[in-house]
């Protein structure tokens, strides 16, 4: 059965919670795909051999999507978090905007064909930080206000705006207030379909650059009717599992009328210097307990980010069935 428009679902069906897939990059890595690349999880798509029906890497990507869908995911992402034009053109054989457009079109078409018409598809757009590896600090240098964010996002954003297979555009893991304000300043001519913004927030409930959730909410409320009507959800992603429910609760309190989304990491902690993951010493809550808190605090899309697997998504889906 074909899906209804996602804006209609979020606005007119307030009891419906969608299940997002999990940590695609880390899951592909666990399945043997080499993503040690400046374009990270998009690396397999840059090889012409990927598009051959017999490609082993293609089969692994399809199996990952299949396992997430079997687990209960009904909204999935394109594997394009680090596929901005700047990173792709600097690190692959794709050098022109025309070739880049064909590249994104192929990824979106492949994903839509595989997940079917009944599930929603998010066009994933990573932050400016992804190009310079500072998602965990939000340090955009001495003059973040002077960065041309629109120029950076434009090629990928325009493609997703125009692609009918994309239901929702996701600006993921935004760690810097200047970048957030830039995105929020863009009107319907720049972002012409439903979108969300996922904030990268630390364990102290601060944006990675130190901005408070209260400052963010004051800015959003201050935009009034100037805000892009296509902003469908706000939320957090790539955040600590243990702190995610509290962070979402705070965001819900600051933006009580805003539909929210949340997809935390698995609970393992990433060391950006060593590029390794390790288990925390403190005990983690389980998904059922955490998802109930998410639902109670306005979450309409729930999934997983780094190191979350189909098993995690199955637990999320079970809890959503129970509490929504």
Swiss-Prot record:
It is an enzyme of class 2 (transferase). Keywords: Amino-acid biosynthesis, Cytoplasm, Metal-binding, Methionine biosynthesis, Methyltransferase, S-adenosyl-L-methionine, Transferase, Zinc. InterPro entries: Betaine-hCys_S-MeTrfase_BHMT, HCY_dom, HCY_dom_sf. It is found in: Cytoplasm. It catalyses: S-methyl-L-methionine + L-homocysteine = 2 L-methionine + H(+). It comes from the Eukaryota. Its EC number is 2.1.1.10. Zn(2+) binds at residues 238, 305-306. Residues 6-320 form the Hcy-binding domain. It holds the Pfam family S-methyl_trans. Its cofactor is Zn(2+). One of its GO terms (biological process) is methionine biosynthetic process. PROSITE patterns: HCY. One of its GO terms (molecular function) is zinc ion binding. The keyword Transferase applies. GO terms for cellular component: cytoplasm. PANTHER family: HOMOCYSTEINE S-METHYLTRANSFERASE 1-RELATED, SLR1189 PROTEIN. Homocysteine S-methyltransferase involved in the conversion of S-adenosylmethionine (AdoMet) to methionine to control the methionine/AdoMet ratio. Also converts S-methylmethionine (SMM) to methionine. Present with 606 molecules/cell in log phase SD medium. This is Homocysteine S-methyltransferase 1. It comes from Saccharomyces cerevisiae (strain ATCC 204508 / S288c) (Baker's yeast). The gene is MHT1.
